[in-house]
């Protein structure tokens, strides 16, 4: 496999080296190799343009969504990525901040109660989907004495649509289309829906409508006329069956 230059964006340099090494090991064990593997945080933020231009793969790391969002704004990452042609991979908070508007789901104690906590922030605009990762791990969690999803996130979903992703699922986008691979759910207008079941129901309804429309334009297939020999053979068969019944 071709070796690539990879560049990983981190917001807390205390963890940069640790997470970067773990990420590098995961890719290596999956058959990917990199010529260079560099991180970007506040220590080398001035080198951002050079690092991004050299990279072929950009990984948006995890962390605290609002904190990461501030860092991305500070280094004007949206503009840096807009003028480049890179493979971009987002993990956890990185995938969330990849949307046009990120839903910064309350995570730390006190955030859901803080009137100054901003739950919707302008982000990178890589995807249109608002992602909520790790759903299988956090769907039953409580925060500030309330159910994280049922009493906080569901309310915030009014007029919006959040796509939950279990670990192992991912969203793929090419600039035109976005496709979710794996089991996921949509939280919208305080309701939870299974994405696949919704897609299957919609597809079935669409196919039925197409069939009805086609019947209006497609002429029925005429029955094939029988030859004289076929008619005689058919008559003989019926007569034979009739005589057989009389004998019995």
Give the location of each predicted region.
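C-terminal and late-domain segments of enzyme folds
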Residues: 1-2, 8-10, 14-21, 104, ...
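N-terminal beta1-alpha1 cap of cysteine-dependent amidohydrolase-like domains
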Residues: 1-57
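Short, well-ordered alpha-helix to beta-strand connector turns
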Residues: 55, 84-85, 127
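Catalytic nucleophile loop
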Residues: 59, 82-101
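Short glycine-rich anion-binding loops that position phosphate/pyrophosphate groups of nucleotides
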Residues: 63-65, 93-94, 136
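Short, active-site-adjacent cap segments at secondary-structure transitions
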Residues: 66, 95-98, 170-172
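P-loop/Walker A phosphate-binding loop and immediately adjacent motor/lid segment at beta-alpha junctions
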Residues: 75-87, 158-161
